[in-house]
């Protein structure tokens, strides 16, 4: 059956495909710097820094003004609405600083969860109303990709088929709207690590979720070559007593992806899901060394796992700028190595990089 009503022109498809490929080229990944005001406040509270717009701006300025060689490791940065319009201390927009480094600018587009009545505290995601207009404005303001996070959890009767289908369709509708406005959609269906489930249970659920997501993307005529996937790695629940090796995590993760994600998708950028910085790197490296066919780029889209050591080094003090940038650069470089399967663990990581970053029922 011929598609009589094409969703995108060949020119639109090429632009989207080119953007997606740029973000994940040569082991590059994504810095997720799209924490909301409240989430950033929790991070600042841990280092005893007040949650003000100026303090948030100062920390992000330090990250974004790092040496230009960061563009060898970071292909894209996801911003929060506030950050997109912030400037450095010289009056230059953050987004322009990033673009001049050759880094693609993205934006968080979802507007948080809303309860699904009749379920065990499951949610759907808000933000479709007015999304097309927001995307059009962001495109004018220099944004080239978007991000939308759907949350599914493993618990009694969870995730329900209703939650899976509702979130899959919402992700697909968002992706379609993004592409109509020239933005590459990052599709993020996260099976969160809360709970005591084992690795096999997480793999089973992750496969069900991803299968539903790609069915919905197909139903909505989404151009897969112009998308990126941001999934959870397949891991046991945070409260599971059995511990698994990075190789076991890798095999379960790549198997789940192999069964559900079409080869047309150019890149899969994993979220870190509250892992320590070091575990997020070790698992990504093992995934890239997994002896299964991997038709996609397998990279990272980390927030906490790129920023924890940097935030600890900063401590809210301007004189710590150099140490903060060095800590951030180190995590970016090692994750780029891991995205190529070339990371060698030396065992000399600092305390901040080995500390678990798990937060129950985590929200951005």
Swiss-Prot record:
Q: What EC number(s) would the UniProt record show?
A: 4.1.2.13
Specify the species. Answer: Oryctolagus cuniculus
Which Gene Ontology terms cover its molecular function? fructose-1-phosphate aldolase activity; fructose-bisphosphate aldolase activity
Per the record, its GO cellular-component terms are: centriolar satellite; cytosol
What functional role does this protein have?
Catalyzes the aldol cleavage of fructose 1,6-biphosphate to form two triosephosphates dihydroxyacetone phosphate and D-glyceraldehyde 3-phosphate in glycolysis as well as the reverse stereospecific aldol addition reaction in gluconeogenesis. In fructolysis, metabolizes fructose 1-phosphate derived from the phosphorylation of dietary fructose by fructokinase into dihydroxyacetone phosphate and D-glyceraldehyde.
Q: One biological-process term from Gene Ontology?
A: fructose metabolic process
Question: Subunit structure, briefly?
Answer: Homotetramer. Interacts with BBS1, BBS2, BBS4 and BBS7. Forms a ternary complex with G6PD and TP53; this interaction is direct.
Give all Phosphothreonine modified positions.
Answer: 39, 119
Q: What is its main location?
A: cytoplasm
Entry keyword annotation includes Lyase: yes
What are the record keywords, sorted?
Acetylation, Cytoplasm, Cytoskeleton, Glycolysis, Lyase, Phosphoprotein, Schiff base
Q: Which residues carry this modification: N6-succinyllysine?
A: 13, 121, 317
What is this protein's name? Answer: Fructose-bisphosphate aldolase B
PTM sites of type Phosphoserine: 36, 89, 132, 272, 276, 299, 301, 309
The kind of enzyme this is, by top-level EC class, is lyase
The entry sums up its family as follows: Belongs to the class I fructose-bisphosphate aldolase family.
Point out the annotated site residues (description: Necessary for preference for fructose 1,6-bisphosphate over fructose 1-phosphate). Answer: 364
Compartments annotated for it: namely:
Cytoplasm, Cytosol; Cytoplasm, Cytoskeleton, Microtubule organizing center, Centrosome, Centriolar satellite
User: Which residues are involved in binding beta-D-fructose 1,6-bisphosphate?
Assistant: 43, 272-274, 304
Q: Which residues carry this modification: N-acetylalanine?
A: 2
Q: Which gene encodes it?
A: ALDOB
């Amino acid at each position: 059956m011929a598609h009589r009503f094409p969703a995108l022109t060949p020119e639109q498809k090429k632009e989207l495909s080119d953007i997606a490929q740029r973000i994940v080229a040569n082991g590059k990944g994504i810095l997720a710097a799209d924490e909301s005001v409240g989430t950033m406040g929790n991070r600042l509270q841990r280092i005893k820094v007040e949650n003000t717009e100026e303090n948030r701006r100062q920390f992000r300025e330090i990250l974004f003004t790092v040496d230009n060689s960061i563009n060898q490791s970071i292909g894209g940065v996801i911003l929060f609405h506030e950050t997109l319009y912030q400037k450095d201390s010289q009056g230059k927009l953050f987004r322009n600083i990033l673009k001049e480094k050759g880094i693609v600018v993205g934006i968080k587009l979802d507007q948080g969860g809303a309860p699904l009545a009749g379920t065990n505290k499951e949610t759907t995601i808000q933000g479709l109303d007015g999304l097309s207009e927001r995307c059009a404005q962001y495109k004018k303001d220099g944004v080239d990709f978007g991000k939308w996070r759907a949350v599914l959890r493993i618990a009694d009767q969870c995730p329900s088929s209703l939650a899976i289908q509702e979130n899959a369709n919402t992700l697909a509708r968002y992706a379609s709207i993004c592409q109509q406005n020239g933005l590459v959609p990052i599709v993020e269906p996260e099976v969160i690590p809360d709970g005591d489930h084992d690795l096999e249970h997480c793999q089973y659920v992750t496969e069900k979720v991803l299968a539903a997501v790609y069915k919905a993307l197909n139903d909505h005529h989404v151009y897969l070559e112009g998308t990126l996937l941001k999934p959870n790695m397949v891991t046991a629940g945070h409260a599971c007593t059995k511990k698994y090796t990075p190789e076991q995590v890798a095999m379960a993760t790549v198997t789940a992806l192999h069964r559900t994600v079409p080869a047309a998708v150019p890149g899969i950028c994993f979220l870190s899901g509250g892992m320590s910085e070091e575990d997020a790197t070790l698992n990504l490296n093992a995934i890239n060394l997994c002896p299964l066919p991997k038709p996609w780029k397998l990279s990272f889209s980390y927030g906490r796992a790129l920023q924890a050591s940097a935030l600890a080094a900063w401590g809210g003090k301007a004189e710590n700028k150099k140490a903060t940038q060095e800590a951030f650069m180190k995590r970016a470089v090692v994750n780029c190595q891991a995205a190529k399967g070339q990371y060698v663990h030396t065992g000399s990581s600092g305390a901040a990089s080995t500390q678990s970053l798990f937060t129950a029922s985590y929200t951005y």
